[in-house]
Amino acid sequence: DVVVAGLYMKRATRQLLKRQGMRVAEFDIARSIDDVKEQIRRMGDLVGHPDRAETQVARLDAAIVRAKQAVARKPYRVLALSRRGWVSGDDSITSALLSITGLSNAAASLGSHSSGFATLEAIVADRPDFILISDGRDVADDEGSALLLHPALEKLYPPSRRRIIPEDLAVCGGPMLSDALDRLVAELKRVGG
């Protein structure tokens, strides 16, 4: 048996598991496509299915090829925006996905090369071409997601200027990034590439 843990989960929990004799495989946050591929392969080795891991890596490589063929004609500035104003910086999987498709991550112009929070005022002042969000609902579940429906953002970013990739496809690195890339390509086609 093996317990898979993120390096950023509670250290005490990981230590307890190790003291209990559990084999703990610790994974860092994947910040690039190469990191994702390495982690897929590592997980395949851990569970005794390196062949399945290679299938997923090949699937991701094929999605990258499709995405590069559909590269945006214009280097649109896109801000990946989540609840409470969280933005994905240059050192994120989201930024890697944007780069593959010829888009640029607008977080850097907000002064954030790493992921963090941006104010509504900074977002409105910067005016990226599009915002990338995880759903297109017009009702907020809580105050954090209500920011995405703020009148200023709705005015600047109506549905035609919002790109949607479901959170479960891009929140972490893994085999689902193939689907995230395909979804991003579909979103690009909505604006004519």
Go through each PLM region and give its residues.
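Basic- and aromatic-lined ligand-binding clefts that recognize polyanionic substrates
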Residues: 52-103, 170
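Soluble non-cytosolic domains of exported or imported proteins
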Residues: 7-11, 30-38, 47, 51-54, ...
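His/Asp/Glu-enriched short active-site or ligand-binding loop at hydrolase and phosphoryl-transfer sites
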Residues: 93-115, 135, 161-164
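N-terminal hydrophobic signal/anchor transmembrane helix of membrane proteins
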Residues: 36-40, 49-50, 68, 73-80, ...
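Solvent-exposed, polar/charged alpha-helical surfaces in well-ordered, non-transmembrane soluble domains
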Residues: 15, 38-41, 45, 58, ...
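Sec-exported extracytoplasmic/periplasmic mature domains
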Residues: 18-22, 45-49, 61, 65-72, ...
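Structural signal for conserved beta-strand scaffold positions within catalytic alpha/beta enzyme cores
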Residues: 5, 26, 80, 105-108, ...
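Acidic/His-rich segments in extracytoplasmic proteins that coordinate ligands and/or metal ions
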Residues: 1-46, 117-161, 190
